[in-house]
Swiss-Prot record:
Membrane disposition: Multi-pass membrane protein
GO biological process: one example: sphingolipid metabolic process
Enzyme class, spelled out: hydrolase
EC number(s) from the headed UniProt entry: 3.1.3.64
Transmembrane segments: 30-50, 54-74, 104-124, 134-154
Protein name: Putative phosphatidylinositol-3-phosphatase
Span of the signal peptide: 1-16
InterPro entries named in the record: PgpA (IPR026037), PgpA-like_sf (IPR036681), YutG/PgpA (IPR007686)
Function in brief: May be responsible for the conversion of phosphatidylinositol phosphate diacylglycerol (PIP-DAG) to phosphatidylinositol diacylglycerol (PI-DAG), making it a key enzyme in the inositol glycerophospholipid biosynthesis pathway.
Reactions mediated catalytically: a 1,2-diacyl-sn-glycero-3-phospho-(1D-myo-inositol-3-phosphate) + H2O = a 1,2-diacyl-sn-glycero-3-phospho-(1D-myo-inositol) + phosphate
Length: 159
């Protein structure tokens, strides 16, 4: 098995969170949530939304590239590749409101994404049929979209 180069490892493992010995996918999603929370306190809310959207787009394409590189070294859809979980959890965070209950929405976004990612309902599992990095990324993107929808509905109902 050949050794992968540094940049695909850095991106694909979610800055190393994928090397967690326990639940690497959850570790990647947790790191992404922590990054988002830090940005929440550092940026004006509109800038946070634009930054989050940019992160989703950038890391989706970078994740496809990194996963393709890493699959050739580590095999198909390696558990250490968690950039997909990072992108997946950033998607529902786009629906988090800027109010005094924002942190409950962050917790809900994280939990809903992990549930959709693990259970893989409503076509999420079918996204894994795509080959290479696209298959690695797209199931988590769809899980993130479903989570986004539920967070948006919760915002509409709860406020």
């Amino acid at each position: 098995m050949k050794r992968p180069s540094f940049l695909p490892v850095l991106i694909g493992t979610g800055f190393g969170s994928g090397f967690s010995p326990f639940a690497p996918g959850t570790a990647g999603a947790l790191l992404a949530s922590i990054i988002w929370i830090a940005l929440y306190f550092l940026l004006p809310f509109t800038a946070l939304l634009w930054t989050t959207a940019a992160l989703v787009v950038l890391f989706t394409f970078a994740g496809i590239w990194a996963a393709n590189k890493l699959e050739s070294c580590w095999g198909e859809d390696p558990s250490r590749v968690v950039v997909d979980e990072m992108v997946g959890v950033w998607i529902p965070l786009l629906a988090v409101p800027d109010n005094d209950r924002w942190y409950w929405y962050v917790i809900a976004a994280f939990a809903l994404f992990r549930i959709f990612d693990i259970v893989k309902p409503l076509g999420v599992r079918k996204m894994e049929n795509f080959k290479g990095g696209v298959g690695v990324m797209m199931d988590d993107v769809l899980a993130g979209v479903y989570s986004f929808i539920l967070i948006a509905v919760a915002r509409w109902v709860i406020g």
